[in-house]
Amino acid sequence: GQIRRQRQMCIRDSFSNGDIDGFDFQWGGRLYGVGDYSYQNIKKTQRQKMTIGGEEVVEIDINASYLTILHGISGYPLPKRDDLYAIGGYNRTVVKAWITATIGHHGFHSRWPKNAIQEIKDAGIDKPAELTMGLLQPVILDHFPMLADWPSQKVTWADLMFTESEIIIGTMLELMHSYGIACFSVHDSIIVRKSDQQIAMETLKDQFFRRTGIEPRLKVN
């Protein structure tokens, strides 16, 4: 007969900035799988081999999650393209690396951080040496003007992560309580059975809109 190995799964809710005055569990808040064998730690292609109740799964991603949230809370409409990072003229991985590095920082970088360089290298891209953070900055800000005052904004990466986490947790709870649907989180994406894809996407969009006033672009893997 067929033998299936099962593991008990635990998740923890991890908050940030606990040593800052005014902390009240309002920063961070991502769900993390506990242990080295968490489904969150394996490649997306491996997660596609998961099953829920013996059924194939799909992973539903929020495109440019933090950037989309920032559009919503800043009152800017989303650009009319499926991928926010595809601004034209520049590789989307380089654009994403610039935005990720900036949003994760308190201001604008004067040079590429090591993790951004590694992200670009891992994608197999040879970034031109002359393409500095400073050179790319006006191009990015022209497409995403809400980032122009990022160094002085009160909103930080921890606020964006909390909003994203509330959206994901709200989606999981609604799917469970209203529809009896099992759902696993991977930070800015959710995993559900293939047969639950449509209702899961509708629920995720609704939860996102409730908290940001904007509807996200979703991608299904």
Q: What is each residue range found by the language model?
A:
Residues 1, 60, 176, 190:
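Catalytic phosphate/metal-binding cores of nucleic-acid and nucleotide-processing enzymes, i.e., regions
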Residues 149-166:
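Adenine-nucleotide phosphate-binding core of ATP-dependent small-molecule kinases
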Residues 197-221:
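Polymerase palm active-site segment centered on the conserved acidic dipeptide of motif C
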Residues 12-34:
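N- or domain-start disorder-to-order transition segments that initiate the globular core
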Residues 61, 99, 181-192:
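Catalytic palm active-site di-aspartate
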Residues 31-154:
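Helical catalytic core of nucleic-acid polymerases
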Residues 1-13:
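Single conserved hydrophobic/aromatic residue that forms the stacking wall/gate
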